Amino acid sequence: MSGRAPFIKPVLEYNEHGWGPCEELSVDVPYQPFCKSDRVGKISDWTAPPTERKFANKYVSSFGNSNQYAYFHEDDESTFHLVDTSGFKGFRPFQRGRFRGNTRNNPRTRGRTGRGGAVTGTGGNQPGVGVNERTKYGKGRDNRRQMGRRFGRNAPTRMRESSVVVRSDWVSIEEIDFPRLLKLSLPNVKEGQDVVTCGSLEYYDKTYDRINVKNERPLLKTDRIIHTLTTTDDPVIRRLSKTIGNIFATDEILATIMCCTRSNYSWDVVFDKVGNKIFLDKRDNAQFDLLTVNETALEPPLEEEGSINSPHSLAMEATLINHNFCQQVLRGGDQKKYQFEEPYTLEESGVDLVSIGYRYKQWDLGNNIILIARCKHNGVLQGPNGEVQFLSIRALNEWDSKASNSLEWRQKLDTQHGAVLASELRNNACKLARWTVESVLSGSDQLKLGYVSRVSTRDHLRHVILRTQQFKPQEFSTQINLSMDNAWGILRCLIDIVMKQPDGKYLLMKDPNKPMVRLYDVPENAFESSDEDDLSDDKLFLLSN
């Protein structure tokens, strides 16, 4: 027994006061740092080949990446070393194929897809930029700026000016925002009945239907005169106001009010209430008759005043184009004309007037509201069965496709005219909606649209006709999502508000910077001169009789 080693009983740690660890810690046991978010899948990695190069460190422990796990020795700093962890990326869950994007046309991935080409481009001094990603000037594209300009995220806010200066003595009556107006509806409004028809119309020249980009035709200037009479200046409306109706307006004014929810620019309409009658009129020397250009575009014209691409210059250009186009496409001269029942009241001997026919129509809007409106046609067309079809002729104009961020007509109009029309519906939604409402109110059988472009982007005086297109107004209103029930509801709502007010003059104005309309009570002489005072006296005389 003396030759054997003695048996020494081991010392067992025993906690007599609880179930936890002993009070005396084992300071000599090595400690392995860990993080509870680490993956515990290392034991199965040997079953798959090591092909994950992009996420090679997906199982690496992320312990110590944050400063909260850092160890600082305060007593002995001789063995302390700083470890640079700036190059280590935080742990991200591995997801195969996420955010892969379009690799078919990407020159950076052609080397991996087997489509040819290198993995990295060789454009200038910037490695890794493909040839297709660079412009012709050798500068790489800034995709973030492109996206910002495209969707208007970084576009500067521009405060638009009001169509009329609001004075301090004007009383605000009502403010209606567009969401409320869009909920209005007045269904089952019957077709308007003709009360008086006057004027003469020329026949449409069908050769303009065969015009295309390769067979363009220059736009000619016309010297024919057109009278733009307001509601109270129209002698026929003055005559009708004695007997029938209590609401009087023109188709341009009605279309502006009915399509107000699509407008961005400011405009105003005057309501003259005398007794139980209301005259919807426009101010003299106002820009009400000018056609807007790219009003609803993401990037409307922002050029300085005096430039050919300023909003006012483009509006003047578009108005002249429409005036010349609607007369050029007609067979003038000594050709046969379509005559209405009465001649035009302002016809003078030796004066060449434009081809235009007026229909004074009557609508019953309910609640004893009878609307009398002057509508117009621009021409007539011989139908396939010999019937006469009335036309509303309008023209869209192209001024600079690059500046307006739209399609170039000379390249897309013949092959993709639907895409061109969709672009115009996006940039000129309000103008096209007004034209459609005017065509529906007048009862036109067709809406003729012409595509007129500048000869040069820097020349706003010479234009060419590239194409014509025709639509049925009712079908076209459905295509552009224009609800006539909502349009009638907006008009009826504003009429009811003015009907409840005392006699006087009221101004309906579109807010220049907010989607709402405002109704003001203005003085009688707010917009009138001495001649207009005489006109107001004549109107009161007519109503008294």
Curated annotation (Swiss-Prot):
Region feature (RNA gate): 287-301
Protein's UniProt name: Eukaryotic translation initiation factor 3 subunit D-2
Primary location: cytoplasm
Family the UniProt entry places it in: Belongs to the eIF-3 subunit D family.
Keyword NAD: no
Biological process terms in GO annotation: cap-dependent translational initiation; formation of cytoplasmic translation initiation complex; regulation of translational initiation
Lineage: Eukaryota, Metazoa, Ecdysozoa, Arthropoda, Hexapoda
UniProt-recorded Gene Ontology molecular function terms: mRNA cap binding; translation initiation factor activity
UniProt feature, compositional bias: Gly residues: 114-127
Source organism (scientific name): Drosophila pseudoobscura pseudoobscura (Fruit fly)
